[in-house]
UniProtKB/Swiss-Prot annotation:
Entry keywords, A to Z: ATP-binding, Cell inner membrane, Cell membrane, Membrane, Nucleotide-binding, Translocase, Transport
Matching InterPro entries: AAA+_ATPase, ABC_transporter-like_ATP-bd, ABC_transporter-like_CS, ABC_transporter_ATP-bind, P-loop_NTPase
Protein name: Taurine import ATP-binding protein TauB
Top-level EC class: translocase
Chain sites annotated for binding ATP: 38-45
Keyword ATP-binding annotated: yes
Reactions that this protein is recorded to catalyse: taurine(out) + ATP + H2O = taurine(in) + ADP + phosphate + H(+)
Tree of life domain: Bacteria
Principal subcellular localization: membrane
Cellular component annotations (GO), alphabetically ordered: plasma membrane
Gene Ontology MF terms: ABC-type taurine transporter transporter activity; ATP binding; ATP hydrolysis activity
Gene: tauB
Membrane topology, from the record: Peripheral membrane protein
Domain ABC transporter intervals: 4-233
């Protein structure tokens, strides 16, 4: 059963000549990791902002467990490419920040924060300052902070886009481990094709101007990693390579078609 439902969603920014999204129908349920991929102008970030409640659709409706999404909520945790951490606070305070705003007592919020730091392999980092962390460690803190509030779903806006290739792969693998352990549905947007194919249980390919769903693929590579198969074995699987090439051709076709319009 779907937890999150998007029905015939359309969106257009004030003053824009054309809509940014049109007729988007999507659902996200338990044990799903839904990835949206597409060229510039396909509305990936706008779609995430709609689900997060940062902007409102021009048409259609978005519901979480049957209740309309009217604005931001702790039920939808968000991880951004820019981690937006508080540099004057230590790691523990950053992870516990949302809980503090929600009025959670100090002992409870710090206990929860330490649990989330352990989940993202940062146990013992609670007193570190943000400036002492690498880019990958900062993203782990951002992920722990989003999870600390125990959201119903996790939204991720190109979370690994600014990382080097090695750290990006580490973070992809960590995300799959966290996804398996928490069983939280994840909606992630990316511009990286191999990342999308590796992570997704459901991969939505978006076409641009206006953003719309061109193709919806059901994949199992991320589940295979979560079940214990190595990333190297998965990425050398001929079926993975074939899927990656299919997605690359689809994205390239959409981009070429747009340039010819």
């Amino acid at each position: 059963m779907a937890l999150l439902q998007l029905e015939r969603i359309g969106a257009q920014y004030p003053g824009a000549a054309a809509p940014v999204l049109a007729d988007i129908n999507l659902s996200l349920g338990p044990q799903q990791l839904l990835v949206a991929l597409g060229p510039s102008g396909s509305g990936k970030t706008s779609l995430l902002n709609l689900i997060a409640g940062f902007i409102k659709p021009g048409s259609g409706r978005i519901t979480l467990d049957g209740i309309p999404v009217e604005g931001p909520s702790a039920e939808r945790g968000v991880v951004f490419q820019d981690d937006a951490l508080l540099p004057w606070q230590n790691v523990l305070a950053n992870v516990a920040f949302g809980l503090e705003l929600a009025g959670v007592g100090r002992l409870e919020r710090e206990t929860r924060a330490r649990e989330m730091l352990a989940l993202v392999d940062l146990a013992g980092f609670d007193q570190r300052r943000i400036w002492q962390l690498s880019g990958g460690q900062r993203q782990r803190v951002g992920l722990a902070r989003a999870l600390a509030a125990d959201p119903r779903i996790l939204l991720m806006d190109e979370p690994f886009g600014a990382l080097d290739a090695f750290t990006r792969e580490q973070m992809q693998e960590l995300l799959l481990q966290v996804w398996q352990r928490t069983a939280k549905p994840v909606f992630l947007i990316t511009h990286d094709i191999e990342e999308a194919v590796f992570l997704a249980t459901d991969l939505v390919l978006l076409a641009p101007n206006p953003g719309r769903i061109a193709e919806h693929l059901h994949l199992d590579f991320g589940r295979r990693y979560a079940a214990g198969e190595s990333a190297r074995a998965i990425k050398s699987d001929p079926r993975f390579i074939e899927t990656r090439e299919h997605v690359l051709a689809s994205v390239f076709s959409q981009r070429t078609r747009e340039q010819c319009v």
